[in-house]
């Protein structure tokens, strides 16, 4: 095939190119790369360029037919034949084909004259009519005018890119913003394209600020937009039959799905993608956000999505959206969010059944996970994209753990932010009071960010745009992944996190990947400083979250999806007998998952079921009892205002999830710690603690209480 090499078109740095062997392998993609508008430009391709190397552009027939010609009409108006999605002035394809076949044509710069008929036809319409009417020919038989007609339509769509900037239509599908992140460069794009067309799975890791979250998923969506449904990548383009090329593919609008652990990440990434594609707001864009109650939020709910959907979903909702997805991308896998691990398991197990093209895992670091990933995914492609901070980050190990003295020595300038990591919400609130009592100058603004804060995006937007204050942000590990605070120049990190373990939890040191993520909160927009008040040899090397989680949610989801409870797990518990113990417990409390799995799964998706015992009520109780339970679930987080009905007390007593108070101690601060043991415990640590203010103490030593909620933890007599 007569084509130019990509290396002859684009400037390729041989020293930094990660995949030199594949660049000229895909020369036909030279003008269909994702435009970063820094080195690859969203461009208008000229007739001259097409005529010089027509076969270089032939593959554009597929996305043009898919995105434009597939639902187009031929129109005749003012003696001009053209393509339009209008339903007026239509003319049949056979009529136009006969006009073209039986008359002499004069090919001019902008259109084609049909001699003797006083008619003109656009190159797009000429190409459409002559190609659709001769679908048995090979692509190699297309003439340069037909190929230019394809490109004229592609120019109209705005899906073409080039090594040089050219004019383009004002009404293109997208208006791409400039990005110089490493993942937008040609070698990485072509590697992602290769994975896409070969239907391979991959694990992607790399340095901070290379575009793991902001770019890589967008590349999979871009190639899905252009080529979803096309399967014939194993032969040369010129040998392909037109019929096979554009009529055999399945044009179902399969989505690209990016799965993230938290709603705040979904919102921030959603806004990022919307703006990067040139949209002012989410409605009318291809971006769809999925998390609980998103329909109530006008800024984040897309009631009019276009084209091939690009879905950003929290892991909890992803597990029900994997079907009809082309590329399933699970980000932040190093966090081992429970539903993230479940989503990985469903995608791998159902890949063939659901015709998933790619499963893509993204992580800051993979050292602790790579052995398991290689076992779980056979022949997975491993991609590492090296990157340094866009700006230098100075790392300091500080023996003085006093945050006040550190701030005095390293306080950022006005308009900048400092992020201080602590392990618990309680610790954050304590230090907020301390800082507010010491930093009394009005120049300082102090914020807390954690999972209980509902308006995180609004807080971040406010402090990023406020140039008149110094912003001090106290955060749990909530801020360590993906969320970028553009004016952050300083991070102070005690290296600790609170790890939930069944009904209790403990403070522990963070992992290597978490350290990298926290350090990476600075150095993206400007130079920064990372101060740690711990030694790096205290970092955790391995930690299995599943060893400290109840397994009933895994079992319920796996049962519904006909998956093996143990072998299909992405991360397996060290003690496999826990699975059998959980299954036996379900039987003992009259939860027949074999008989009622559809009902149970629907309730599991509709309500925040934080205790497996609730499922027994949905199966065995009356409608009025179920209504009481649902009202309780909706109000549990405002339990101090909730009036507990007597009938609901009876229901929970019957569930019989009991615990005994085994110890009561008073802290130095005057609070009361009560220790409990779960009676008839079937899994995990049976011991847990609750703290009360002395005036609000409600428990008595050796008394039995009933657990009615595990998250938040709530007991009744």
UniProtKB/Swiss-Prot annotation:
Pfam families: DEAD (PF00270), Helicase_C (PF00271), NPH-II (PF12011). It is found in: Virion. ATP binds at residues 206-213. It catalyses: ATP + H2O = ADP + phosphate + H(+). SMART domains: DEXDc (SM00487), HELICc (SM00490). Keywords: ATP-binding, Helicase, Hydrolase, Nucleotide-binding, Transcription, Virion. Residues 406-566 form the Helicase C-terminal domain. Its EC number is 3.6.4.13. NTP-dependent helicase that catalyzes unidirectional unwinding of 3'tailed duplex RNAs and plays an important role during transcription of early mRNAs, presumably by preventing R-loop formation behind the elongating RNA polymerase. Might also play a role in the export of newly synthesized mRNA chains out of the core into the cytoplasm. Required for replication and propagation of viral particles. PANTHER family: ATP-DEPENDENT RNA HELICASE (PTHR18934), ATP-DEPENDENT RNA HELICASE DHX37-RELATED (PTHR18934:SF99). Belongs to the DEAD box helicase family. DEAH subfamily. Monomer. This is RNA helicase NPH-II. It comes from Melanoplus sanguinipes entomopoxvirus. The gene is NPH2.
């Amino acid at each position: 095939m007569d084509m130019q090499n990509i290396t002859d078109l684009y400037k390729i740095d041989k020293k930094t190119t990660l995949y030199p062997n594949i660049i000229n392998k895909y020369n036909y993609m030279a003008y269909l790369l994702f435009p970063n508008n820094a080195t690859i430009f969203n461009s208008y391709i000229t007739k001259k360029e097409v005529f010089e190397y027509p076969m270089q552009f032939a593959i554009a027939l597929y996305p043009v037919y898919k995105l434009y010609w597939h639902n187009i009409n031929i129109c005749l108006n003012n003696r001009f034949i053209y393509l339009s999605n209008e339903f007026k002035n239509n003319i049949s394809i056979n009529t136009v084909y006969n006009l073209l076949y039986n008359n002499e044509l004069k090919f001019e710069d902008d259109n084609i004259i049909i001699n003797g008929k006083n008619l003109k036809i656009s190159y797009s319409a000429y190409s459409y009519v002559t190609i659709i009417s001769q679908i048995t020919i090979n692509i190699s038989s297309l003439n340069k005018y037909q190929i230019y007609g394809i490109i004229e339509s592609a120019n109209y769509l705005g899906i073409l890119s080039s090594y040089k900037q050219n004019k383009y239509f004002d009404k293109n599908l997208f208006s791409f913003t400039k990005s110089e992140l490493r993942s937008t460069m040609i070698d990485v794009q072509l590697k992602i394209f290769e994975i896409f067309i070969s239907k391979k799975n991959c694990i992607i890791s790399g340095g901070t600020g290379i575009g793991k979250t902001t770019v890589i998923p967008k590349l999979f969506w871009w190639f899905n937009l252009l080529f979803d449904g096309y399967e014939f990548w194993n032969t040369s383009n010129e040998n392909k039959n037109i019929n096979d090329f554009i009529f055999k593919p399945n044009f179902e609008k399969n989505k690209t799905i990016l799965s993230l652990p938290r709603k705040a990440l979904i919102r921030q990434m959603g806004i990022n993608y919307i703006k990067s594609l040139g949209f002012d707001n989410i409605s009318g864009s291809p971006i769809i956000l999925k998390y609980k109650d998103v329909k109530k939020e006008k800024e984040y709910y897309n009631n009019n999505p276009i084209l091939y959907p690009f879905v950003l979903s929290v892991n909890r909702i992803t597990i029900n959206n994997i079907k009809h997805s082309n590329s399933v991308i699970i980000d932040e896998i190093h966090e081992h969010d429970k539903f993230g691990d479940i989503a990985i398991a469903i995608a791998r197990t159902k890949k063939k059944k659901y015709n998933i093209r790619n499963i893509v895992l993204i992580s800051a670091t993979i050292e602790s996970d790579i052995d398991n990933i290689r076992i779980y995914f056979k022949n997975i492609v491993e991609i590492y994209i090296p990157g340094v901070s866009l700006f230098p980050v100075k790392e300091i190990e500080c023996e003085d753990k006093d945050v006040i003295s550190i701030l005095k020595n390293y306080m950022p300038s006005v308009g900048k932010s400092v992020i201080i990591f602590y392990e618990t919400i309680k610790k954050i609130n304590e230090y907020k009071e301390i800082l507010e009592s010491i930093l009394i100058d009005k120049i300082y603004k102090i914020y807390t960010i954690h999972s209980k804060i509902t308006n995180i995006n609004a807080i971040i937007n406010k402090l990023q745009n406020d140039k008149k204050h110094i912003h001090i942000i106290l955060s749990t590990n909530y801020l360590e992944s993906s969320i970028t605070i553009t004016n952050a120049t300083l991070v102070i990190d005690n290296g600790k996190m609170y790890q939930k373990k069944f009904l209790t939890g403990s403070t522990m040191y963070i992992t290597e990947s978490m350290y990298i993520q926290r350090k990476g909160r600075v150095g993206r927009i400007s130079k920064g400083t990372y101060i740690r008040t711990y030694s790096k040899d205290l970092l955790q090397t391995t930690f299995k979250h599943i060893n400290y989680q109840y397994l009933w949610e895994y079992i319920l989801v796996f049962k519904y999806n006909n998956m093996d409870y143990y072998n299909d797990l992405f991360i397996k518990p060290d003690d496999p007998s826990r699975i059998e113990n959980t299954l036996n417990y379900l039987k003992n409390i009259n939860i027949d998952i074999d008989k009622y799995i559809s009902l149970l799964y629907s309730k599991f998706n509709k309500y925040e079921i934080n205790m497996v015992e609730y499922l027994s009520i949905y199966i065995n109780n009356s409608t009025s009892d179920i209504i009481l339970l649902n009202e309780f679930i909706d109000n549990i987080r405002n339990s101090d205002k909730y009036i507990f009905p007597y009938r609901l007390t009876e229901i929970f007593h019957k569930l019989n999830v009991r615990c005994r108070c085994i110890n009561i101690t008073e802290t130095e601060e005057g609070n009361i710690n009560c220790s409990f043991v779960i009676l008839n415990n079937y899994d995990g640590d049976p011991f847990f603690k609750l703290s009360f203010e002395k005036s609000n103490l409600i428990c008595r030593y050796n008394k039995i209480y009933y657990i009615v909620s595990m998250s938040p933890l709530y007991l009744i007599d």
